[in-house]
Amino acid sequence: MFHFPSIHRTIFPCGLLRSSCVTHARHIISLLTDTNMKFVLTKISRNRKLGPIPSVIASSDTCPSDCILRGRGCYAELGPISLQWKKANDNGMSFDPLLREIRRLPKRQLWRYGTAGDLPPDRESLLRLAAANQNRPVLVYTHGQDFPGYHLANQLGFHVNVSADDISHADRLAKTGLSVVVTISSDYARKPKESLSDYRTRLGGRLKSFTPEGRTIIPCPASYTETTCLDCQLCARPRRGGVIVGFPAHGSRRAQIDKRLSNGLSKPKIDKGLGGSIEPRAAA
């Protein structure tokens, strides 16, 4: 059983949790962390980029109120996934049944948490989710700011990526010691019928780019190759050297995101391998 010291000190002043009290303690923890969070679990995703893995949608009340994408480019607010998100909001399972489903996943099963929605906003629920995962590889991204909580989740084998709004923000988030991903211009996505060679040429020869403070950014491989998250798993583990993964703006609101990024904050300089750099062309 995973222990929650802050709760144990409140319920058991001696700091000890006797075996006869386990059921009672779990009930108290459930009461203390009760929220209206709802979830939809898809056992085998049909998402082309994810691949055939389990995925979870969390209700919209898990999203931070200050998320910059709220109404300003969040892909989950429109399109087919918005219908599934509404299903989670209206008729999704509650938190405890979700945890039971996660515990039943195969031992080494990669899965995706939060194709819409975010992590539980309270730390106790976050750590219960992390404990239920039991060290499985998982794809998790958050716009939340409970950085100490995410470190604790990481220690339980629940690897959390924090999402940056632009590359300057990515530099700030990198100082937390957590894995970072960042939204970048849709120019970094390979265009339909564009060859890989032409794509590389358009971006200056190499795909590697840099933040203002010199941290390495690489585009999500699924944005320019036929790979899937199941094949890649780059975001499911810590990345050597703190490499930041860039996700090109996508979805029906990508132009809106590009406009927000038009100040250049998410158009990092491209390393041509010749000691110089160029800027990708401006978004249309």
Residue ranges and their predicted role:
Residues F2-A284:
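Class I S-adenosyl-L-methionine
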